[in-house]
Amino acid sequence: MAILRPSVVSPTRPTVKTEVVYARGMESIVLFGPPGAGKGTQAQRIMDSTGLPQVSTGDMLRAAVSAGTTTGIEAKKYMDAGQLVPDQVIIDLIKDRIKEPDAKNGVMFDGFPRTVPQAEALADITTVSHVISIEVPDERIVDRICGRYTCAGCGAVYHESFKPTSKDGICDSCGGDEFKRRADDNAETVMSRLEAYHNQTSPLADWYESKGIFHVINGDRAIDLITNDILDALK
């Protein structure tokens, strides 16, 4: 079982449970979430609370290619040809990663698996004890992403509704007055990405739900409340 260690209570903010200690041997977590759901923020908090390292297959692929490992050389052939890297290559990378000392109690997978066959292959090499799905209504995702803009000078990130500049048109960090938006931060592109995400993850969610380890977390709330629900699910 997992032992939860609470943090000091804050008089103005929800109590954030700060540490989950695993006592069950090597078990891993899978983290789902559409773009704009705040998955990156929660991933960092899960790592801080559980001690499990985050495993991103994209990062692992790039590192393996850069290092010129056997698996990296194999992956590069497909990447250079503009093809998807086969599942077995990804699984080989994961096998190597979970042998590292920091993964002795498990890892947190981010961005993998994406398909049921990948989930089945993953189950052959590590025990997935919890699957966390951070869910936010599509219209809220569109608002979050399309309202983002950054300072052209220092890269500080703002949002029209949630985090505007203190002084209209002036960056709080550097005082610059030029801002930019990502070209793909528009409603049409975001909705297309969300549709692809839902189509991809729906069968996978059903598969994990059938295992009794799938946890839906309401991501349309305060960050601390989301974190607490995730850590409760990991007990």
Positions of predicted regions on the chain:
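Glycine-rich phosphate-binding loop of ATP-dependent small-molecule kinases
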Residues: 1-235
